[in-house]
């Protein structure tokens, strides 16, 4: 729910101050942190609420920096193709990952019907680590080629 308000806020921060790759790194680190914490055997509703709030911040940070960064990296004549490929990959993930996670949850369901989500959260944390790596690669590539990911969009 927080991403509804936070994504435009973070987008305006990116427009004004830049630091797109940094915002993606921070968001990816927060995402990973939350899933690692959820994988731990801690049973606290207060912690769960705090972690969900942090997750909302992470889900606001990453797209607010990712989408406006695409035209900085991809030539204008290939921008439609680039966005199409991004949505294509995203839709593959939306189609296949829930099936995989469902199988993992089913395999981790005890005879009493209680599901152990440790492996599921570890998978999501691994996706977060991949996002961190990709974000750092974008930062390094931006420094090398000068795409302007760290520069503001509005002057």
Language model region names:
Residues 67-73:
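Intracellular helix-loop hinge segments at the cytoplasmic ends of transmembrane helices
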Residues 8-12, 99, 133:
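Residue-level hotspots within transmembrane alpha-helices of multi-pass secondary transporters
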Residues 76-110:
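A late C-terminal transmembrane helix in Major Facilitator Superfamily
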Residues 20-66:
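C-terminal transmembrane helical hairpin of 12-TM major facilitator-type secondary transporters
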Residues 39, 122-155:
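Multi-pass alpha-helical transporter architecture, strongest
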Residues 3-8, 91, 95:
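Residue-level signature of mid-helix packing/kink "hotspots" within the transmembrane helices
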Residues 103-128:
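A membrane-interface helix-boundary motif in multi-pass transporters
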Residues 6-19, 105:
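Helix-to-loop junctions at the C-terminal end of transmembrane segments
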């Amino acid at each position: 729910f927080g991403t509804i308000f936070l994504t435009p806020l973070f987008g305006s921060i990116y427009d004004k101050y830049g630091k797109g790759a940094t915002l993606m790194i921070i968001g990816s680190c927060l995402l990973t942190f939350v899933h690692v914490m959820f994988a731990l055997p801690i049973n606290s509703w207060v912690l769960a609420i705090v972690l969900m709030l942090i997750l909302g911040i992470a889900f606001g940070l990453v797209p607010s920096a990712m989408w406006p960064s695409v035209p900085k990296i991809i030539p204008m004549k290939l921008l439609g193709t680039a966005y199409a490929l991004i949505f294509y990959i995203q839709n593959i993930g939306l189609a296949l990952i829930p099936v995989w996670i469902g199988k993992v949850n089913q395999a981790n369901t005890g005879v009493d019907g209680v599901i152990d989500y440790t492996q599921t959260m570890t998978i999501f944390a691994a996706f977060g680590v991949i996002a961190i790596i990709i974000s750092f690669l974008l930062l390094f590539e931006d420094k090398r080629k000068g795409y302007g990911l760290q520069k503001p969009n509005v002057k």
